[in-house]
Regions:
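Anionic-ligand anchoring segments at beta-strand to alpha-helix junctions in alpha/beta enzyme folds, i.e.
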Residues: 1-13, 186-189
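Alpha-helical support elements that line or immediately flank enzyme active sites
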Residues: 183-195
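Active-site cavity-forming subdomains of large catalytic enzyme subunits
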Residues: 11-166, 170-173, 177
Length: 195
């Protein structure tokens, strides 16, 4: 819906605002560990950059998992084309968008949001196997509870902050994972800032 609008030019700026807001939140110095909830496009890189400003804190990123399939990408594209041609109203366009993105979770295709989830798991910041479990399922709930338990356990050990965990090898592993899985090319911009 926002493709081609002026606000799209602010994508990297908004990532940096997310990083700053994360760092401001952590700056109150009252945390033993932190859970990071965010999956979409520039949110995860922003959270990651902000978390590293407080590298002494253990960090666990909690994925949402991909939403279940809604309106297919082909059907959604058809409605978008019809809207661009003036054949359907804005209301029809918005109904199609809502049917395609109808629930909690990441988009149903392997774009930036799902690449973020995979990247965080490869870098050791998600619980293993948690990236692609659908929201609203008993397993997703159990993984979220276990992520909290993991953050508490990490807070008991002084050398488990995200700054101790992230190094050049971890970044390279993330890049290899992105390349091996056909991950989002948006990370060619984000991974440099994250490193």
């Amino acid at each position: 819906v926002t493709q081609g609008e002026d606000g799209m030019e602010l994508s990297l700026f908004s990532r940096d605002v997310i990083a700053l807001a994360t760092a401001v939140g952590l700056s109150h110095n009252v945390f033993d560990a932190a859970l990071f909830l965010g999956v979409c496009d520039k949110i995860v890189p922003g959270l990651f950059i902000g978390a590293l400003q407080f590298g002494h804190l253990p960090a666990v990123f909690v994925p949402a998992g991909p939403m279940t399939s809604g309106l297919s990408n082909d059907d959604k594209a058809k409605v978008r084309q019809q809207y661009a041609q003036g054949l359907v109203s804005r209301e029809v366009l918005l109904e199609a968008e809502q049917a395609a993105y109808h629930s909690a979770g990441t988009c149903t295709f392997y774009g930036t949001a799902n690449s973020n989830q995979m990247l965080m798991e490869i870098m050791g910041l998600h619980l293993p196997g948690s990236s692609f479990v659908n929201p609203g399922t008993p397993l997703r709930e159990a993984l979220t509870v276990d992520a909290v338990k993991r953050a508490v356990a990490l807070s008991q050990n002084k050398a488990t902050g995200i700054g101790y965990q992230i190094n050049a090898k971890v970044i390279v592993n993330g890049i290899v994972g992105l390349l091996a899985t056909g991950g989002s090319t948006n990370h060619t911009l984000h991974i440099v800032a994250m490193a």
